[in-house]
C-alpha cells in the first residue's frame, strides 16, 4: 500500500471500514424492532414465517424483508437457545446474504451467524445449504441451530455419508440442509449418473453458506471428487477376445464396387480406406461359438441381443487392433505401455490414447498392462461445484490473506467483520533455533512452565508425525497431555472443547478441532447444576489469571492463513491469551527460503546450542517467504482451474443432455432426428454428388449398413431403377425406420420408448466416461508442448474441443447403430439392456499434482489474465458444444 493510500485510509477509512459502517445503519433498524418482537407471543412470532412467504409470493424481495427477518431470528434464538445475536453477528449475516465472505474471528459465533441468511433465503422455497467440513459438525449444527428453525416452522435436514437414499432425498427437500462439502459434491455426480429423475436427490443449487470457506475453496481446490467404477471385468473381456482373434480368417475378394467377387469365403472383410473391419455372416457365427466356449456368452443368446451391445464393440475393437494397426508403424511398445506414433510426423505422442476400446485392445494384443482409463465415471473439483450455486457465500476466521483468490476465482468479496470485543491476544515474536531437537526441547520447557502455573496450552503441529514426536518428548518430561489428529471428529471435538481447562496440554494437528471453540475453564454442560456452574466460574477466572490459552506453533506453515488459524484459537471473545511460534533452520520453510542468511546471522552472533533468535525483523522475513509460497500456490491453482474449466463447460453440456433425456418419457422424435443426421453423414462417406458414379462405393455402403445397422438393403437394385442419390438416401432412412417400427410392434410402444431411452443414456455415459479418460491423458501430456514454444493451456483447449465434438458425433452414431442392429423377438425383455449401473462404484477425494507445471508455464499463466467464470449460458447464446447453433436450438 502506498503512503498516500495509507494516509487516505486513516482519514476516510478503508473500503472494508466504509462498507461495515453502512451495514451498521441496517443493524440500527433491526435493533429498533427488538422491543416489538419481544412483545410477540410464541405463536405470533412463529406466524411471521408464513407472513414473510406470503409477502414474497406478492412480489416483495428478500432484501425488502431482511430487517424484519433478522429481527425475528434474533428474538427466536434468544428464546430457544438463550443466545442473542450481537450487532457484529448481524453484520456478518448481511455480508453472507449479499454473497460475500465474512471473516470473523474464532469464538465470534459463526454458527449462529449462519442462521440469519439461511432463514431469509429459505423463505423463497428454493432451499439453503449450510456446508461444513465433516459429518460431526454438520450433525451437531443441524441439531443445535435446528431448534431455531423448527420453532419458526422451517424444516431442517442433515446430509452426511452413508445415508439411505430416501433419507437423503428428504433432507435435500428441507428448507435448510446442513451438509458436508464432500457429500454435496458426490451427490451431484451420482445424480448425473442416474437413469431416472426419481433416482436423483439434489434439487436446484440455490444458496450456499460455506463454513471454513478457506479450507474448502482454497486448501482443497486441487483435490477433485471422483466417482470410479469397476473395470476388472472389462480387462478380462479384452483378454478373452484377444485370444479369439487368431481364429478368424480374412475373406479374399477381387474387383471393386459392383464387380466384387468372393474368391475365398472368410470371417471378415477389411475396408482400409475407412480403417474398418466387418464381420461376415460366417464371422458372426464363429464369434458367437468362440464366446460361448469361453463362457463369455450364454448358449442360445445372440451376439446382437440387447444385453450384448458392448460385447460387440469389444470384438470390433480387437479386430481393428490385430488387422489394421501395426507395431512400430502406428504405435510402439515402451516401458509396458502402447505409445501412439503420429501418422504425419512419425513422432511418438506419450499420454495420448485411442478411444472406443481400441487402445485396450492393442494393449491386450501386445501383452502389456491394460490401463484402466475408463475407471473414472465422473469427476468435479470443489471450485467448479460450488460455482454452480446461484448465490455462494462463506465464513471463516482467516480469509483476508486469500481475498484476491476468492475475488478472482469465485467472484466473492472478503469483508472483515469487527470482533464483538477487542482482542486481548499477545502474539509473541518467533523463536528460531539451529536444530529441530533444540526447538522441541524449548517447546517442552515452555509447556512445562505453563502447566505449572495452570495455563492451558494448545500445541499445533503440521503433521501427525510431529505430534507423536512432541508427545514422546512430553512423556519423557512427565507432562500430562492429550494428543489428537484429524481421524476421529467426535473425539477431537470433545478434547478441544476441554483444552481450556486449568493446566490442560493438548497436541493437535493444525486442522484438528476446527469449528469447536476452546472455552477457558473447560466446556460447561447444558445440564450443569448450580454448584457445577459456580465451580466452572472459579476455574474460568483462574485460567484468565494464568494468562488464558497459550498457543504454541511448532513451525511456520507455507500459508500465513494457516498460522493465523492456529493463533485464532486463543483469546476468543475478548479473553486473554498468547501465542508463540518455535522454528528451526531445519524446518521446511526455513530451509528452502531463509536458512543461509539466517544461519550466517546466527554464526556471526556466536550463538550457543539451545540459544534462539527472537526479533520482529525475523518475523517479517518469514512472512515474506510465506508470501512467495502463497503466490506460487495461487498461480498453480489458477493454472489448474483453466484446465478444469474446459472440462466443466463440457460437463454441463453432457449433464444437460442427460437431464433432457430423463425429463421426457418419449424420446422417439429425438432418436429420429439423430438417425437422419447420422445416416446423411454416413451416406456421404461412400456416395456423394461430387463424385463420378463409377467412384461410388456402393458395395462398401451395403456392407457397412449390414454390419453396423443390420440392414440388408438392395442398393444396386434401387440404383438400377434409375433413382438419384437423394432418393437412395431417403430409402435407406425409411428402411431403417421400418426396421425399428417392426421391433416396436413386437415389444410394444411403451417398452420400446423405455428401451430407446436406456440405450441413449447408456451410450452417452459410456462415451463420456471414455472422453474423461482421454481428457486426463491429454492434460498430462500437453504440458510437454511448452518446450516447443506452444502455450499448453491453449493447446489443451483446442484439442479437447475437437475431442468433445468428435465424441458427440460418436454418441449419435452409436445410438443409431445400437437401436438399429439389436435383435428383438417375442421372447426379448428390453429392460435387460446393459446399463452402466452403479454397483461397485467407489467415491474418492483424490489428491492431484500440479500436472508437471513448469516455470515457463507459470509465466504464461501470469501473462494471460485469468478470466472469472462466465455467467450461465443464455438460451440465445451460442452453444458451448461448438455446433454454431443457439443454445436453445441445440442443447437448451
Curated annotation (Swiss-Prot):
Subcellular location(s) per record: Cell inner membrane; Cytoplasm
Enzyme class: translocase
Top-level taxonomic group: Bacteria
Residues bound to ATP: 89, 107-111, 517
This protein's record includes keyword Metal-binding: yes
Primary localization: membrane
Membrane topology recorded in Swiss-Prot or TrEMBL: Peripheral membrane protein
CDD domains registered for this protein in UniProt: DEXDc_SecA (cd17928), SF2_C_secA (cd18803)
Transmembrane feature ranges: none
EC number assigned by the record: 7.4.2.8
NCBIfam families assigned: PRK09200.1, PRK12904.1, secA
Family in the record: Belongs to the SecA family.
Protein name (database record): Protein translocase subunit SecA
Source organism: Ruthia magnifica subsp. Calyptogena magnifica
Amino acid at each position: 500500500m502506498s503512503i498516500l493510500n495509507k494516509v487516505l485510509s486513516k482519514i476516510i477509512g478503508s473500503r472494508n471500514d466504509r462498507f461495515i459502517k453502512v451495514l451498521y445503519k441496517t443493524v440500527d433498524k433491526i435493533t429498533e424492532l427488538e422491543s416489538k418482537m419481544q412483545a410477540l407471543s410464541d405463536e405470533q412470532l412463529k406466524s411471521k414465517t408464513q407472513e414473510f412467504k406470503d409477502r414474497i409470493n406478492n412480489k416483495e424481495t428478500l432484501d425488502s424483508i431482511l430487517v424484519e427477518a433478522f429481527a425475528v431470528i434474533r428474538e427466536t434464538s434468544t428464546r430457544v437457545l438463550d443466545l442473542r445475536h450481537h450487532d457484529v453477528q448481524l453484520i456478518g449475516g448481511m455480508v453472507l446474504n449479499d454473497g460475500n465472505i465474512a471473516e470473523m474471528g474464532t469464538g465470534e459465533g459463526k454458527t449462529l451467524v449462519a442462521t440469519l441468511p439461511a432463514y431469509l433465503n429459505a423463505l423463497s422455497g428454493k432451499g439453503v445449504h449450510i456446508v461444513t467440513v465433516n459429518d460431526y459438525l454438520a450433525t451437531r449444527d443441524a441439531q443445535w441451530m435446528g431448534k431455531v428453525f423448527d420453532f419458526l416452522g422451517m424444516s431442517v435436514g442433515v446430509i452426511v455419508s452413508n445415508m439411505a437414499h430416501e433419507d437423503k432425498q428428504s433432507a435435500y427437500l428441507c428448507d435448510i440442509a446442513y451438509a458436508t462439502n464432500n457429500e454435496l459434491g458426490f451427490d451431484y455426480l451420482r445424480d448425473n449418473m442416474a437413469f431416472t429423475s426419481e433416482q436423483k436427490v439434489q434439487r436446484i443449487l440455490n444458496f450456499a453458506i460455506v463454513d471454513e470457506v478457506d479450507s474448502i475453496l482454497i486448501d482443497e481446490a486441487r483435490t477433485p471428487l471422483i466417482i470410479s467404477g469397476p473395470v476388472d471385468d472389462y480387462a478380462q473381456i479384452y483378454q478373452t477376445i484377444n485370444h479369439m482373434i487368431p481364429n478368424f480368417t480374412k475373406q479374399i475378394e477381387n474387383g471393386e464396387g459392383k464387380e466384387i467377387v468372393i474368391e475365398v469365403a472368410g470371417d471378415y472383410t477389411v475396408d482400409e480406406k475407412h480403417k474398418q473391419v466387418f464381420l461376415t455372416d460366417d464371422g458372426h457365427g464363429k464369434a458367437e461359438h468362440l464366446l460361448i466356449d469361453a463362457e463369455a456368452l450364454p448358449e442360445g443368446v445372440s451376439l446382437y441381443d440387447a444385453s450384448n451391445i458392448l460385447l460387440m464393440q469389444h470384438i470390433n475393437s480387437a479386430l481393428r487392433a490385430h488387422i489394421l494397426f501395426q507395431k512400430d508403424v502406428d504405435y510402439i511398445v515402451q516401458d509396458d505401455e502402447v505409445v501412439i506414433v503420429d501418422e504425419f510426423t512419425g513422432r511418438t505422442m506419450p499420454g495420448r490414447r485411442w478411444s472406443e476400446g481400441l487402445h485396450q485392445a492393442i494393449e491386450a494384443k501386445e501383452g502389456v498392462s491394460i490401463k484402466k482409463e475408463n475407471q473414472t465415471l465422473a469427476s468435479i473439483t470443489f471450485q467448479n461445484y460450488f460455482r454452480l450455486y446461484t448465490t455462494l457465500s462463506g465464513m471463516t476466521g482467516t480469509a483476508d490473506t486469500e481475498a484476491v483468490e476468492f475475488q478472482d476465482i469465485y467472484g466473492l468479496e472478503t469483508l472483515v467483520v469487527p470482533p464483538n470485543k477487542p482482542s486481548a491476544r499477545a502474539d509473541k515474536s518467533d523463536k528460531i533455533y539451529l536444530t529441530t531437537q533444540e526447538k522441541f526441547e524449548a517447546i517442552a520447557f515452555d509447556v512445562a512452565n505453563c502447566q505449572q502455573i495452570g495455563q492451558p496450552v494448545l500445541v499445533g503441529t503440521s503433521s501427525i508425525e510431529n505430534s507423536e514426536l512432541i508427545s514422546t518428548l512430553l512423556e519423557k518430561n512427565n507432562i500430562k497431555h492429550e494428543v489428537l489428529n484429524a481421524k476421529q471428529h467426535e473425539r477431537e471435538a470433545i478434547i478441544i472443547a476441554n483444552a481450556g481447562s486449568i493446566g490442560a496440554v493438548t497436541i493437535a494437528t493444525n486442522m484438528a478441532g476446527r469449528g469447536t471453540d476452546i472455552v477457558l475453564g473447560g466446556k460447561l454442560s447444558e445440564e450443569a447444576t448450580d454448584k457445577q456452574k459456580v465451580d466452572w466460574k472459579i476455574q474460568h477466572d483462574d485460567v484468565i489469571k494464568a494468562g488464558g490459552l497459550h498457543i504454541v506453533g511448532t513451525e511456520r506453515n507455507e500459508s500465513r492463513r494457516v498460522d493465523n488459524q492456529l493463533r485464532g484459537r486463543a483469546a476468543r471473545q475478548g479473553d486473554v491469551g498468547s501465542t508463540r511460534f518455535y522454528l528451526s533452520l531445519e524446518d521446511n520453510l526455513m530451509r528452502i527460503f531463509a536458512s543461509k542468511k539466517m544461519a550466517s546471522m546466527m554464526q556471526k552472533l556466536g550463538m550457543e546450542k539451545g540459544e534462539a533468535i527472537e526479533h520482529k525483523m525475523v518475523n517479517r522475513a518469514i512472512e515474506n517467504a510465506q508470501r512467495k509460497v502463497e503466490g506460487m500456490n495461487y498461480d498453480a491453482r489458477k493454472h489448474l482451474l483453466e484446465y478444469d474449466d474446459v472440462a466443466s463447460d463440457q460437463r454441463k453440456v453432457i449433464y444437460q443432455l442427460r437431464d433432457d433425456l430423463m425429463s421426457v418419457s418419449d424420446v422417439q422424435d429425438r432418436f429420429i432426428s439423430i438417425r437422419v443426421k447420422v445416416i446423411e453423414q454416413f451416406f456421404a462417406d461412400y456416395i456423394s454428388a461430387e463424385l463420378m458414379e463409377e467412384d461410388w462405393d456402393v458395395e462398401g455402403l451395403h456392407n457397412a449398413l449390414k454390419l453396423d445397422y443390420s440392414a440388408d438393403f438392395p442398393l444396386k437394385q434401387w440404383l438400377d431403377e434409375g433413382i438419384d442419390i437423394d432418393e437412395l438416401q431417403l430409402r435407406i432412412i425409411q428402411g431403417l425406420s421400418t426396421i425399428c417400427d417392426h421391433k416396436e410392434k413386437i415389444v410394444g410402444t411403451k417398452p420400446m420408448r423405455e428401451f430407446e431411452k436406456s440405450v441413449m443414456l447408456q451410450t452417452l455415459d459410456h462415451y463420456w466416461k471414455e472422453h474423461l479418460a482421454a481428457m486426463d491423458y491429454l492434460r498430462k501430456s500437453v504440458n510437454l508442448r511448452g518446450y516447443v514454444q506452444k502455450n499448453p493451456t491453449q493447446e489443451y483447449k483446442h484439442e479437447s474441443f475437437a475431442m468433445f465434438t468428435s465424441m458427440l458425433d460418436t454418441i449419435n452414431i452409436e445410438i443409431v447403430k445400437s437401436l438399429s442392429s439389436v435383435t428383438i423377438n417375442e421372447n426379448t425383455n428390453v429392460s435387460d439392456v446393459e446399463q452402466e449401473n452403479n454397483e461397485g462404484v467407489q467415491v474418492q477425494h483424490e489428491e492431484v499434482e500440479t500436472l508437471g507445471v513448469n516455470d515457463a508455464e507459470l509465466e504464461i499463466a501470469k501473462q494471460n489474465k485469468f478470466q472469472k467464470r462466465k455467467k450461465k449460458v443464455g438460451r440465445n447464446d451460442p452453444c458451448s458444444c461448438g455446433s454454431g447453433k443457439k443454445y436453445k436450438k441445440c442443447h437448451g
